[in-house]
């Protein structure tokens, strides 16, 4: 028996890293989990490796209608939604004077607009059940967790676009918490620091991802990785499992 038996969770960007660790933890506690990733093969593999009940929605969540389709996949699979973790994201780093409009907009799209669209699409599936439960004298809580970053709370040189997107998600979180508290929806943001994922791995030719047919370089230079680790009280980055709360 898990504390999440019978619950349904959507975790975006959940085929790797923090998202996967979160999906695994939710599944271990009894939740059915919708896995999402740009890469359908990786998403299917992750779903097959998670012991609990899963479904998959593969695709670019910034595409028109994708967030609605993501939510509908969860409804078609299980008929309800209890938990949403807005985790999907990546980085395109550059100093401000060399950053293109496109690079700036893409970070806002994935880190702020996609969570907004997912939440908006899920609204009737979170609010309407709560209205009925309130009439019946029940108190059932649902959860939304938006993944931010210390880049959004403190800023980070070379990441004006990412920092802006991650700062905006904090404002969205606070606003939604005030709007949906009456429906017993707890809305929180988690601002991670240095977690060992492919976004913080060594910056080399092999560490790339494809977005919209374009290869995007991921990672940070080894010198900066070493400097960052020195600033962490533990003396090392966090792991995806620690970030997930396991």
Where are these regions (language model features)?
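Residue(s) in the substrate-gating loop at a strand-loop-helix junction
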Residues: 149
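A glycine/serine/threonine-rich, flexible loop-to-helix segment
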Residues: 182, 194-231
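Active-site loop immediately N-terminal to the catalytic Tyr-X3-Lys motif
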Residues: 97, 154-160, 182-183, 235, ...
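Substrate-binding pocket helix/loop in short-chain dehydrogenase/reductase
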Residues: 95-96, 103-108, 228
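Alpha-helical segment proximal to the catalytic Tyr-Lys
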Residues: 124, 178-182
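Active-site helix of classical SDR
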Residues: 119, 165, 173
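Canonical Rossmann dinucleotide-binding motif of NAD(H)/NADP(H)-dependent dehydrogenases/reductases
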Residues: 2-34
């Amino acid at each position: 028996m898990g504390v999440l038996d019978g619950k349904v969770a959507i975790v975006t960007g959940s085929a790797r890293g923090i998202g996967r660790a979160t999906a695994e933890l939710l599944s271990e506690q009894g939740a059915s989990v919708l896995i999402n990733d740009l890469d359908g093969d990786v998403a299917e593999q992750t779903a097959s490796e998670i012991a609990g009940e899963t479904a998959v929605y593969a695709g670019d969540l910034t595409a028109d209608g994708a967030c609605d389709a993501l939510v509908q996949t969860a409804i078609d699979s299980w008929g309800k939604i209890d938990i949403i973790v807005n985790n999907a994201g990546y980085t395109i780093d550059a100093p401000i004077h060399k950053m293109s409009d496109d690079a700036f907009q893409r970070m806002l799209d994935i880190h702020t607009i996609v969570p907004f669209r997912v939440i908006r699409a899920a609204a009737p599936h979170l609010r309407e059940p709560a209205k009925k439960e309130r009439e019946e004298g029940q108190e059932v809580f649902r959860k939304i967790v938006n993944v931010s970053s210390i880049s959004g709370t403190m800023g980070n040189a070379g990441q004006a676009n990412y920092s802006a997107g991650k700062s905006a998600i904090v404002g969205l979180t606070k606003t939604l918490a005030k709007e949906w508290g009456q429906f017993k929806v707890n809305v929180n943001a988690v601002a991670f620091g240095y977690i060992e994922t492919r976004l913080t791995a060594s910056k080399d030719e092999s560490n790339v991802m494809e977005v919209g047919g374009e290869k995007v370089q991921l990672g940070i230079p080894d010198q900066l990785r070493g400097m960052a680790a020195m600033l962490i009280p533990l003396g090392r980055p966090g792991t995806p499992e620690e970030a997930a709360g396991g």
